[in-house]
Amino acid sequence: MNSLFRFFLIISIALLMVHCASSIPKKSIEDLKTAFNSESTSADKYSKFAEKARVEGFDTIATLFEAVSKSEAIHATNHVKVLEKYGEHAITPQIASFEVKTTAENIQTAFNAETYEMQTQYPVFIRDAENEKAAEAAKSFTWAWDAEKKHLSYFSVATTSLTNGSEKGLSFNWYVCPVCGNTYNAEDLKTSCDFCLTKQENFIGFTEKSE
C-alpha cells in the first residue's frame, strides 16, 4: 500500500512539474527582455535628445523629448516587473548605441523608432503573449503600444513645426501617467488616464522650464 501511495505521489509531482514548465510563457519572456532593452535605450536616447534641443534653442521640443523619455522609462519598468513575476531577476538593461545629431535629425530618428515599435514590435509581442495566455505581459505590451501611437503623432507634429520654422504647433506642457506611461499634451489632458484610470493629479508634469 505504501509503495502504491509513493508511486502515485511521484506521478502527481511529475505531472505538476510538467504543467508548471509548460505554463511558463517562454516567448513572452524573451519579448519582454527585448522590449525592456528597447524602452531603456529610448529613455536614455530621448533624454540626450532633449539636452541637444535645449542647446539649439528648441525648448518646446526639448520638453516633449523629456516627457517621452519618462514614458519610455515607465514602460521599461513595467516590463521588468512582469519579468520578475515570471521568475526572471537581476535584469540589467542593454543600452544600444545611438548618435545625437541635430534636433531635426533626432526627431526623425525618434519618429522612425516609434514607427517600428508601433507597427512591428508591439503587435507581434502582444500576439505572442495572447497565444501563451500571458496576461501580464500582454497588458504591459499594450500599454506601451498605445503610448507609442501617441508619441508617433507628437513627433510628427514636431517635424512639421521644425519644417515650418516654428515650434508654435507644439504644446508647452506635457503629462505622463506614472503607472502605464500614457502621455498627454495640455489640449488632450483627461481627468484620469485612458489606459489605467490613474487620476490626473498623479500625472508627472513637464513644462518648458523643466530642469
Model-predicted regions and their roles:
Residues 21-211:
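Non-heme di-metal
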